[in-house]
Amino acid sequence: STETRRMLRFRCAEQYLDPKVLEYIEAHGLYGTGENWRSLPFEKLKQASLSLHDPKRVPHVIGCCETAARLARRWGADEALAARAGILHDVTKALSKSAQLLLCEKYGIMTSEFERENYKLLHSKTGAAAARDVFGECDAVCSAIYWHTTGKADMTVLEKILYLADYMEPCRKFDGVEKLRTL
């Protein structure tokens, strides 16, 4: 399934496949398991990230990435880091509840009962862990991804940029978004 292929990319497919099948896949580098996604140049990172999304989500991810880069330029933050955070911010969003919880277990991510009941919130935490461990991203990018859904007090400029970019990117349609985009 698509989810199994995604979990192979996150190096967390043990519960989806027979151990001998998984060993064969990894030994032969099938389904991209032999690829190194750490510290990729941006265009390759973009390709890798978008390959993990549902096609309907791709315009949002690209819009968030471009909006984050634009906001970084406007507010004097690192544009490259903002773009990297934007392209990876929803990298685990397509995963099911069981896959999200499996990633939480793999990465030692503590979850609340509320998060387990509303598992779509977990993608920010699992996405940050994947950004760190699979893509080799720096702490600033990972932290921005971690907080892009809930926010927190005393956010860094990059964290604020990603939070806002996700909220106001061009695919978002709600009353007041156009005014927000002009600020």
Please identify what each model-predicted range represents:
Residues 1-2, 41-42, 96, 112:
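General structural signal for secondary-structure boundaries
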Residues 1-37:
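Classical nucleotidyltransferase
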Residues 3, 12, 20, 41-48, ...:
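Exposed alpha-helical structural elements
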Residues 33-53:
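Extreme N-terminal tail/first-helix region
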Residues 47-52, 60, 69, 74-183:
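Divalent metal-dependent catalytic cores for phosphoryl transfer on phosphate-bearing substrates
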